[in-house]
Regions:
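Residue-level signal for inorganic ion chemistry
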Residues: 49, 107, 122, 158, ...
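C-terminal catalytic and target-recognition region of SAM-dependent MTase-like enzymes
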Residues: 231-233, 348-370, 376-380, 386, ...
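Hydrophobic/aromatic anchor residues within beta-strands of the central parallel beta-sheet
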Residues: 289, 341-343
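Conserved Rossmann-like nucleotide-cofactor binding loop
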Residues: 127, 297-298, 370
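Conserved proline-anchored active-site loop of SAM-dependent methyltransferases
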Residues: 107, 267-277, 360-376
Length: 482
């Protein structure tokens, strides 16, 4: 089942789903994240509203331009939200989740529930759109907002940063993302999990490249996480392939050193929530790890993640007796004795408020950013961000780098990561940081990938028929302290 058709599988009346989807679109326009909207919905509404909201937000620019042509006088915000939601769902960019006549009929029914006086107006506008759709689509395609479904400032920034790739990045952001899994290396192998999925009738692909640590699996079709075998028992997590690069990069060998970090190394995950990278580190290494986050509520999500994966904070195993205890390479089971995980709330820019004075062997700084590299996975991001956000976040990133660098041991390494394709948050940030350091005090590692631009979706294969490497947009820089 694809996200564009997922809503059709739920028993809730479409008019109710459209009403709440319009509320979600209106909230995003007002600056609220889609996640914040969805968590307030009743459980029976949430899946359908999420599916329709993702579709509507991907085509919101085209729908907004079309509405301006169909109804030049902007209607009240609640009416406009329902109208552009329906137009986006009718837009020919991808298969509609419902038949056209059903969408129009149910949008009018939603209007009668939401704003009865506007029902006839919405009916007339939508039916006119269907009559004049080809001409309207052609007209809208001549505007940046209508052609690319991103704010003009975002388009301009990508043109500046990626003159050869900006169109591909913008158009790719409206394609559905792959669903990539990370198999818990303490519980099994990626190959064994692919075979287990096949027994359920689910097609999946290995990403065997060493850069991903050998634990990545891509589903041919996304599915609800609770339908994944072993998810509740901690055998697998959902994590994009780009994010799965962090742990192998941080723990692996540096230039001229084949050993990598030793067992028991002291590691800081400086912006740990929601805990995916923290967990990956613990799944593949024996560490003394401090997971830090400025938000205590988000830090609780790290604890939830570790609990589900049976990676608790005192080093003991939490593997139920009825589950197979897959052996570690050294023959142990569960979290290895001697490993230690501590969760602490604190601002990475203010080490004096949380640091105990013991230096770290390695620091992971997955810094707050615009999330411009994961917009296909979070389609509300493009409408929530403002033109000056990248500059403001870059200042925060710079402050974090400056505050954390002194906490490293000589010979230690810092991995800087953002899920952004904007260079101000990636290579430009690192270039400026290195220029501020004393000469010879830092050694950038050439095997870190730098900017990773979002790759094709999981329907794309190379000439051999093998699935392409699939990942979100990311940036990685690995720096050794000399």
């Amino acid at each position: 089942m694809t996200p564009s058709t997922a809503a059709a599988s739920y028993s809730v009346a479409l008019s109710r789903l459209l009403e709440h989807t319009a509320d979600a679109v209106q909230a995003v326009r007002g600056g609220q994240s889609l996640t914040a909207v969805l968590v307030r919905l009743p459980a029976d509404l949430r899946p359908g509203v999420q599916a329709l909201s993702f579709h509507a937000l991907r085509w919101l620019g085209s729908a907004t331009e079309a509405r301006a042509r169909l109804a030049p006088k902007t209607p009240p915000s609640n009416v406009d939200a329902l109208l552009v939601t329906a137009l986006a769902l009718l837009w020919p960019g991808e298969p509609p989740p419902y038949a056209e006549h059903t969408l129009v009929d149910q949008a009018v029914s939603a209007a009668r529930l939401r704003v009865p006086a506007a029902a006839a107006f919405i009916n007339a506008v939508l039916r006119r759109f269907l009559r004049e759709r080809d001409a309207l689509v052609a007209s809208v395609a001549h505007t940046p907002l209508g052609a690319y479904n991103h704010p003009p400032w975002w388009i301009d920034r990508l043109k500046h940063d990626w003159p050869a790739d900006w169109q591909r990045l913008l158009l790719g952001a409206n394609r559905r993302p792959p669903m990539t899994l990370r198999v818990n290396a303490r519980r099994g192998t990626a190959l064994a999990y692919v075979l287990r999925l096949a027994e359920q009738g689910r097609l999946a692909w290995l990403l065997p490249e060493p850069a991903f640590g050998g634990h990545a699996v891509v589903l041919d079709e996304p599915c609800p996480v609770l339908q994944l075998p072993g998810f509740a028992e901690g055998e697998v997590s959902v994590q994009d392939a780009s994010a799965q690069r962090a742990a192998p990069l941080l723990l692996g060998p540096l230039q001229g050193d084949a050993a990598g970090l030793p067992a028991g190394a002291r590691v800081l995950d400086a912006c740990a929530a929601p805990g995916g990278k923290t967990a990956h580190l613990l799944e593949i290494a024996h560490l003394d790890l401090l997971a830090l986050d400025s938000d205590p509520l988000r830090l609780a999500r790290v604890q939830d993640t570790l609990n589900r994966l049976r990676l608790n904070t005192d080093g003991s195993a939490h593997v139920p007796a009825h589950l197979p205890a897959h052996p570690y390479p050294d023959g142990q089971a569960g979290v290895p004795a001697g490993s230690h995980v501590e969760l602490r709330a604190g601002d990475a820019r203010l080490p004096a408020t949380w640091w105990d004075g013991r230096p770290f062997d390695a620091i992971l700084l997955d810094a707050p950013c615009t999330a411009s590299g994961i917009v296909r996975r979070h389609p509300d991001v493009r409408w929530l961000r403002r033109a000056d956000d990248a500059g403001a976040l870059a200042r925060v990133q710079g402050e974090m780098l400056a505050a954390l660098w002194p906490l490293l041991k000589p010979g230690g390494r810092l991995l800087y990561a953002t899920c952004s394709v904007f260079k101000a948050e990636g290579q430009c940030q690192i270039d400026a940081f290195l220029q501020r350091l004393p000469p010879g005090s830092a050694r950038p590692q050439p095997h870190a990938p730098g900017h990773l631009l979002p790759s094709p979706d999981n329907r794309t294969a190379d000439e051999s028929g093998r699935p392409a490497v699939v990942h979100d947009g990311f940036f990685y820089a690995l720096i050794q302290k000399t």
